[in-house]
Design a protein with these regions (language model features):
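Helix-rich, well-folded core regions that mediate interactions or catalysis
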Residues: 1-218
Length: 218
């Protein structure tokens, strides 16, 4: 149930333990997140993306957007290598829809960036590239027709799935379904990313959404 989701995510991910072991760190990082010249660039990028985060959603008041910004600024101070990357705004906003305390949301975001989407948000996106290769191999093994369909359309797997991963399926699934997936991510961790992605491709194949038999030359 939604009312238990925040506590469950914090406990299952280990974020609650990290928060309790380092009380006050969030406030320290938030204060530090505006001290360096490069922090101003990060803040400007966050400000631009805030207005693109779930546009029209009733929860995104000015006060709520400020909470998103605070969490992202604090994380940029914690992890300068990542600082801020598009996609993190959606993940943070979704976390804050369930988690009231900014420090708790900060630790959940830290878990996502550092243990679920490892090296996805860095400039090289090395972790993302590796995970996409793993997913392509899984699809070849479990859904071999999918690869053929995509090649016929001149599409790569990452063209479809990059935003699935970077936004943790927020842009791919209805909200209630997506948050059930998040329940599994915080419980079972990274393997859920691949299981859900393969299942989505399987559903598309079952419903002929990847059927290219009617596609011909323009």
């Amino acid at each position: 149930p939604d009312e238990h989701r925040a506590d469950a995510w914090l406990l299952l991910s280990g974020a609650a333990q990290k928060r309790n072991e380092q009380p006050g760190l969030y406030a320290t990082l938030l204060a530090a997140g505006r001290m360096r010249p490069e922090d101003l660039q990060v803040e400007e990028q966050i400000d631009r993306d805030l207005h693109r985060t779930f546009p029209g959603h009733p929860a995104l008041t000015d006060a709520f957007c400020q909470r998103i910004k605070n969490v992202l600024l604090a994380y940029s101070a914690r992890n300068p290598e990542v600082a801020y990357c598009q996609g993190m705004n959606f993940v943070t906003a979704a976390i804050l829809m369930f988690v009231r305390a900014e420090d708790s949301a900060f630790w959940l975001l830290s878990h996502v960036v550092e243990e679920v989407l490892v090296d996805h948000y860095v400039q090289s996106m090395l972790g993302h590239q590796v995970d996409q290769q793993v997913l392509e191999q899984l699809l070849e093994q479990q859904l071999p027709h999918v690869g053929g369909h995509l090649r016929t359309l001149s599409l790569s797997v990452p063209f479809i799935t990059t935003q699935w991963f970077l936004c943790l399926f927020l842009n791919a699934l209805p909200s209630e379904t997506c948050f059930r997936v998040w329940d599994l991510i915080f419980c079972l961790h990274r393997c859920t990313l691949f299981q859900v992605s393969v299942a989505l491709f399987g559903a598309m194949e079952d419903h002929s959404l990847l059927d290219t038999s009617d596609i011909g030359p323009a």
